């Protein structure tokens, strides 16, 4: 009997050959090769390019790349080179298809499309054909031109893109050969060749009369709306608008390049295409072997044909005969004196500079007279009259406030009106509020901000009207009102205009601590960040009735708080805008430099008007201004 653990005799000799050989080295080599294979596969998938023809072309315009790419026949090169600069514009949903086309006009990702296509979209995305396939980028409105149905978008990215140069207006003549591009619902590019039919054509869109348009038969589908019309050099002749004519057929219009440059060169530094004398033929010899390609590209008007290997639908509106591309017919060039010529300073016309200065002056006067409302007027004016988006407005207003309220803080500190022991605990809350408000404002979008701004102005107008209707709101000037007669902050401000009255503090008492500091500092920052206003209209009443201090001290303390909140807002707006590719520092800094002098001078004028004009007149002007802002902002939604 064998018990557990016992063995009978000697164990047999190990005859397994594998265990007698060295196996670790080959297995290690095999494992390493497998790892390298998988790593290489992952790298290839990550760096896969559907079309490597455009490597190194990020900083080039279409025209520049077209000259460099000479391997294909001339028109085939055009059809192959233009589509990467043509984008689809749609909503922000994952499965949202394009509602219009667009054209990339700046290497940093600026896109021009039609305003009516994006005005009602809560979110905007841009679909771009890259070497790695179609990519989707979120975008924001930078500026709008309602009179020409244009919207300038900025993709939220710091990447570089192939883009268009702007065609020289002198080369645009009736009969000129052009190509209208777009992207269809599937994101595939489409193009039709045609001719410029007429210049300076009008188009009525609802109640808006659009002028200075080109007519072209190259536009045949709504999918080309917002897309580029280009010439044979690949330069942007204009942005397409597809309209339904009286017969129900699509009629093609184009907002020409000189209109685009005139209205948007304050934000984008456009590249200019090479000029060709009008009436001179542009002969391009087509390379040998292109006959077969043209036989594939030709199609009946209205029936696009896909070009094998190019993924593009081409409609041949005017068939090219022979081996030579058509020349430009002789004719009078399109001269647009309304948008071409004139002095430009930093990309701004003299008229635009005067308009911006006058807006800043009016905002300064309003703020100087009533110590509130100036920021509301500045933001609303930049949105309505100049079409700027909040991404550009906020850093401009913040920079303006830094200078204007910085100077006011120094004056108030010199007059010993700033209560530093009360202000210092509020500064962190004001900074936190403006940062939080900035991101909230970005999240809700410009349309919601416009509504909030209109409602805010409406409330301020109603408040002023109620005070006008009070029995004691007569025709007195600031000097004739005593502090005891001043029952609200507006009347009290008039009593303080001569600097002699010091009203008794009154209001709601809150215990000292973080909660009190938050109540006094956070709301001002939130309103400033969301709406882009200074926030003084919120802070002064809070300082007065919650802080229980006199109006003089409330105004002085508020100026310091607005200054530091604006400094923080400027830093956040520039850092966030630059890191996400939304803004570049040149545009907001230039705008601020234009507007700061007007705002500063306007504040001085407004302070003097407060001392000499009757109270009823001051309140009436203020109420009318706020009511006009509310009406415009709420009806333009």
UniProtKB/Swiss-Prot annotation:
Disruption phenotype: Cells have no magnetic response but still make empty magnetosome membranes; magnetosome proteins MamA and MamE localize normally. Deletion of genes mamH to mamV (amb0961 to amb0978) gives cells with no magnetosomes and no magnetic response. Residues 78-268 are annotated as: Protease-like. Binds to transition metal ions via His-148 and His-263, but also binds metal via other residues. GO terms for molecular function: metal ion binding; serine-type endopeptidase activity. Residues 46-352, 400-416, 460-517, 576-586 are lumenal. Changing residue 148 to A: Loss of magnetic response, no crystal formation when amb1002 to amb1007 are also deleted. Slightly improved Ni(2+) binding. Residues 370-637 are annotated as: TSUP-like. It is a multi-pass membrane protein. Keywords: Biomineralization, Magnetosome, Membrane, Metal-binding, Transmembrane, Transmembrane helix. Its cofactor is a metal cation. In the N-terminal section; belongs to the peptidase S1C family. This bacteria makes up to 20 cubo-octahedral magnetosomes of about 45 nm in diameter which contain membrane-bound crystals of magnetite (Fe(3)O(4)). There is a paralogous gene with partially overlapping function in the genome (amb1004, called limO, AC Q2W8L7). LimO does not encode the C-terminal TSUP domain and does not complement a mamO deletion. Plays 2 roles; promotes magnetite nucleation/formation and activates the MamE protease. Despite its near conservation of a protease-like sequence, this is probably not a protease. Required in conjunction with MamP for proteolysis of at least MamE, itself and MamP. May transport a solute that controls MamE's protease activity. May place individual iron atoms into the magnetite lattice. This is Probable membrane transporter protein MamO.
